[in-house]
């Protein structure tokens, strides 16, 4: 995973962030009570596999270059466990993906980079959940807490 992101970033020079799959968010305010609720839910989730589909491109900053992930029952079940927390619900259908680059770059450049990337593994195990403080205005991502899954 990190090798793939290094190749992409070397060519596109995007902001630095850890490889991740966003399940929920954002939260406008993450107070102590909400934080504890998220931690408690996270500790009940067991490791699970996700299915990787292919490299994908778009002309949107935060989905500019990513790995498309299949909407599996395991993934949706894990995501739905957080439905009673106070994150901002999105109006659009959940598009599970692993971002490789944030920013704008022309399609041809991104297509040429895909040719240099290794074939994707069919499955990847999700073995941890992270609570992340994100400031998209200044391209800053800070992991506040990592919870290992059983």
Describe each PLM feature range.
Residues 1-51, 69-127, 138-150:
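Basic, often amphipathic N-terminal segments
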Residues 56-66:
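Short, basic/glycine-rich phosphate-binding loops at helix/coil junctions
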Residues 60, 127, 131-137:
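Glycine-rich beta-strand-turn "strand-cap" elements at beta-sheet edges
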């Amino acid at each position: 995973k990190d090798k793939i992101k290094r190749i992409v970033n070397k060519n596109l020079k995007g902001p630095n962030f850890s490889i991740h799959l966003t399940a929920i968010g954002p939260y406008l305010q993450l107070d102590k009570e909400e934080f504890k609720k998220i931690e408690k839910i996270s500790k009940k989730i067991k490791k699970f596999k996700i299915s990787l589909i292919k490299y994908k491109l778009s002309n949107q900053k935060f989905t500019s270059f990513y790995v498309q992930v299949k909407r599996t029952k395991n993934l949706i079940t894990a995501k739905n466990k957080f439905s009673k927390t106070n994150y901002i619900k999105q109006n659009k259908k959940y598009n599970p993906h692993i971002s490789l680059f944030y920013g704008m770059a022309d399609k041809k450049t991104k297509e040429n980079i895909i040719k240099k990337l290794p074939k994707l593994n069919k499955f990847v195990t999700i073995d941890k959940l992270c609570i992340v403080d994100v400031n998209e205005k200044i391209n800053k991502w800070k992991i506040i807490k990592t919870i290992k899954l059983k």
